[in-house]
Amino acid sequence: MIQVLLVTICLAVFPYQGSSIILGSGNVNDYEVVYPRKVTAVPKGAVQPKYEDTMQYEFKVNGEPVVLHLEKNKGLFSKDYSETHYSPDGREITTYPSVEDHCYYHGRIQNDADSTASISACNGLKGHFKLQGEMYLIEPLRFSDSEAHAVFKYENVEKEDEAPKMCGVTQTNWESDEPIKKASKLVVTAEQQRYLNNFRFIELVIVADYRMFTKFNSNLNEVKTWVYEIVNTLNEIYRYLYVRVALVALEVWSNGDLSSVTLSAYDTLDSFGEWRKRDLLKRKSHDNAQLLTAIDFNGTIIGLAHVASMCDPKCSTGIVQDYSSRNLVVAVIMAHEMGHNLGIRHDRENCTCHANSCIMSAVISDQPSKYFSNCSHVQYWNYINDDEPQCILNEPLRTDIVSPPVCGNELLEVGEECDCGSPATCRYPCCDAATCKLHSWVECESGECCEQCRFRTAGTECRARRSECDIAESCTGHSADCPTDRFHRNGQPCLHNFGYCYNGNCPIMYHQCYALWGANATVAKDSCFEDNQKGNDYGYCRKENGRKIPCEPQDVKCGRLYCSLGNQLPCRFFYTPTDENIGMVDTGTKCGDKKVCSNRQCVDVNTAY
């Protein structure tokens, strides 16, 4: 029999509640001081690592005992993880530090099925946990007794800035709200989303700019600690999409910025993408890069990213302002921008999650959520299925400390078909929690035509028609996948002859103006479209070898889209240098009687199709 030595550090709850204190997380009103009690099972004679694979702490919150279970986040770093900084004379210095025995954990509260935790145990316990639906923060108090910790609700941290902060991505989907409304009503079940054998893996590089370096007192270790905490939370957030994020490299621009970081978020993103394509990708293989900067961008923007761009050499990037003293906030902003890279757009009012605000809200909430909305789940899976980004299919080599698989730890390990936790907590009906094998009767795990691990009945609608040009699809009864999307022929009149069908949609200029500018927008007068004959920055039809070609007179309604917002703004247009196609009239749009836009030319509908 294996003897187990139980090492227990017994400390009582410090009987004190404070009204206000300044902590690393900011000025906190109403906090509780506790001394966590750590219990660790160590096999007798075993060599104990500095940070165990699993740990357990007991303390009290609001006078009630809680047990915090922690498990080391072994997927935090890739095996070839590297760190790069620059000497004062500009020399690149790259190291490959040993990160196997790190101190970053995920966890849960015992007897609270909806609880989560993201904790650094490097110097005491620092991080956040969800308990009975409320978010709490914990961090060490710098008293003479170093084991004292403050525990407080997130809502008790004073606001850092009253002005609302926003993502700079503009909603450009010109179609009606109907698909979003329908998506918001979809119930995406756990078994449909599980994809246990098809996890996606994002190999992430984070670049901290020179302002970040100086913000943290030019101390590389402080920058690294901050980034590790952010990625630990980022990793936790994305597991709900069945995506694992591994940090493959951290680069700190300790001797000045290597791409242009300016007050314009759009210019900064463009320059960072060019640098990544030109330089970083040649030095380090990775899937996505995020620039973490301490600059205060113009306006209220604190983040920006390209949409549906994962794996693209230039555009699989995002920029994030290190806006808050709470790393949870910064991690949520980074999760938001990476969400754009994964094809997820901003939430509409019909989108919901298990919180007041979801991750893809355009406005960053003062109490940010760690959950993606139902709309985000649908958009993500649509992007994965339609665009099929290949770079995130390969699993990075992880920095595992070799240990036998443990059934019930919610990690899919060698020899397991599934792992949904203990029999008491497992919520995944396809999995036998006792054996970590799929039940023998399981027909499917995920897909539009999979429900409760079985194929949905033949004839069940799995893809509603999105317009009169589309055709609804139904399940076959013998496949988990919805049949291939079909639609009416291109060129068929639609919307009472205001448009012509194109790939299942009925594109008309009014819908595009509505999406760009809101309900008060209409299509501008014909005279506004004449600006497309100028061939300037915004008024043109197409680009050839980087040169903007003006529209021919008959093609002006196939170039830049012009909308009217009333007498004050009769010729409004949208233009952004990060994606110059946004704000152009869409292909297939009616541009005249029996004419549609094709290749930026207004041609006969019969010729186009």
Curated annotation (Swiss-Prot):
Domain of life according to the entry: Eukaryota
Cofactor: how bound: Binds 1 zinc ion per subunit.
GO BP, sorted A to Z: proteolysis
Binding of Zn(2+), residues: H336, H340, H346
Cofactor(s) required for function per UniProt: Zn(2+)
Coiled coil: none
Signal peptide: 1-20
InterPro entries per the UniProt record, alphabetical: ADAM_Cys-rich, Disintegrin_CS, Disintegrin_dom, Disintegrin_dom_sf, MetalloPept_cat_dom_sf, Peptidase_M12B, Peptidase_M12B_N, Reprolysin_adamalysin
UniProt keyword annotation of Cell inner membrane present: no
Record-linked Gene3D superfamilies: Collagenase (Catalytic Domain) (3.40.390.10), Disintegrin domain (4.10.70.10)
EC number of the protein: 3.4.24.-
Binding site for Ca(2+) 3: D470, E473, D485
SMART domains assigned: ACR (SM00608), DISIN (SM00050)
Record: residues binding Ca(2+) 2: V406, N409, L411, E413, E416, D419
Record SUPFAM superfamilies: Blood coagulation inhibitor (disintegrin) (SSF57552), Metalloproteases ('zincins'), catalytic domain (SSF55486)
Family: Belongs to the venom metalloproteinase (M12B) family. P-III subfamily. P-IIIb sub-subfamily.
PANTHER family from the UniProt entry: ADAM A DISINTEGRIN AND METALLOPROTEASE DOMAIN, DISINTEGRIN AND METALLOPROTEINASE DOMAIN-CONTAINING PROTEIN 28
Protein name: Zinc metalloproteinase/disintegrin-like HR1a
Organism: Protobothrops flavoviridis (Habu)
